[in-house]
Amino acid sequence: EWGATKIAVAHNSNDRSETQLFHLFRGSGIRGLASILPVRDRIIRPLLCLERWEIEKFLQQRGIVYCKDATNEEDDYTRNRIRHHILPYAEENIVKGCVAHMNQTAELLAETEDYLELQTKEAAGRCIQATDGDGESAETGDSRNAVICIAVESFLSLHPVIRKRLLYEEVKQLSPGQKDITYQHIQ
């Protein structure tokens, strides 16, 4: 209706830190620890560089009314417990400015993830061929009868990090819609 190509959401650096800790506690890798990205598909997050208090102060100074999700105040959800207890404790007792430091780390990890993703795609081009089960070349996105052929010698010459990432991507391609493919699946 509006002809918009992007959707802007109000995630801020606190949200990013909460997500990063949540992913850390779940045992996520680099992708998860990079946390919330500033741009992902059609979603943009222009406030990711600001802390929640900075946004609220800006709005209050200008008399702008904003909405608060009441469920964010409850401790029923893991993210809220991180928000209400762990991050404030870390800020007060461990490192002042920890949210800013964690966001720096998230940015570095996002850059690292981009690089590793590129390396993984290049390695896939050298090591992986998808067939339709009859030996005919197939798109890896069509997993109904897909068979993944791995050039073993090329695969084994890869760094272990790239091998694991490559296996992860192939399992993901063969299991569309599957959530939570874990480190244990790849081992």
Regions found by a protein language model. Give the residues of each.
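AMP-forming adenylation/ATP pyrophosphatase catalytic core
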Residues: 38-40, 84, 103-187
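A short glycine-threonine-serine/GTX helix/turn-capping micro-motif
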Residues: 45, 68-77, 151-158
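Mid-to-C-terminal catalytic subdomains of enzymes
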Residues: 62-99, 104-107
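Active-site adenylate/phosphate-handling loop in enzymes that bind or generate adenylated species
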Residues: 1-54, 61-62, 89, 119-144
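Alpha-helical structural signal
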Residues: 17-21, 83, 186
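Short glycine-/small-residue-rich flexible loop motifs, especially phosphate/cofactor-binding loops
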Residues: 55-58, 168
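Residue-level signal for short amphipathic helical patches enriched in basic/charged
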Residues: 2, 16, 28, 50, ...
